[in-house]
């Protein structure tokens, strides 16, 4: 019983120390994120993460529907026999880009490091180029045009992450 009483102040001091350490880390993180360039890097990484994770997860959970639609979409193209492989490739690439961008957003907020966000932005840019190519081959010019803002965002993200 006496040992427990003497350990109590030590436990309280340890708890205070860890609480202060967490508060310092949060303060540092907020100070980082309040810088305009860091905030823009964080926000674009988060945007790319949401965009590509949602798109990739939609393809995973609605694979059969997407495959059916894309099979018709590419039926009159040289890629008509590769639709399933293309869908799997794009799905994996989108999920990976989204995960890297999400890890990058966390990394930017926590330490200011840009590595994961850069890899995510670069892969996202390549994904958009692949989608654009597919839309052009399928002669879906409106669909291809709708990808241009995403391409601009992804390239801007890559450039922003070099600052």
Q: What are the functions of these language-model segments?
A:
Residues 50-91:
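Solvent-exposed, well-ordered loop and adjacent helix/strand elements within mature globular domains
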Residues 5-19:
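N-terminal amphipathic/hydrophobic targeting modules at extreme N-termini
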Residues 9, 20-21, 36, 78:
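Proline-rich intrinsically disordered, low-complexity coils
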Residues 13-17, 62, 104:
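Residues at secondary-structure transition points
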Residues 21, 27-58, 88, 92-163:
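Extended, low-polarity transmembrane helix blocks
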Residues 1-2, 12, 26:
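Short hydrophobic transmembrane-like helices used for membrane targeting/insertion
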Residues 3-4, 62, 112:
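Intrinsically disordered, low-complexity regions enriched in Ser/Pro/Gly/Gln/His and often acidic
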């Amino acid at each position: 019983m006496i040992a427990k009483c003497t350990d109590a102040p030590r436990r309280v001091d340890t708890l205070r120390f860890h609480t202060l350490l967490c508060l310092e880390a949060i303060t540092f993180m907020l100070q980082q994120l309040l810088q305009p360039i860091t905030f823009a890097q964080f926000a674009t990484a988060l945007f790319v993460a949401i965009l590509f994770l949602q798109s990739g997860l939609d393809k995973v959970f609605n694979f059969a529907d997407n495959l059916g639609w894309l099979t018709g979409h590419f039926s009159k193209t040289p890629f008509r026999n590769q639709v399933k492989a293309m869908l799997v490739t794009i799905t994996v690439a989108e999920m990976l880009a989204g995960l890297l961008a999400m890890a990058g957003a966390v990394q930017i907020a926590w330490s200011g490091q840009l590595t994961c966000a850069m890899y995510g932005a670069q892969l996202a840019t390549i994904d958009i180029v692949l989608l654009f190519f597919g839309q052009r081959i399928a002669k879906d010019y409106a669909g291809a045009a709708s990808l241009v803002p995403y391409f601009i965002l992804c390239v801007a993200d890559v450039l922003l992450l070099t600052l």
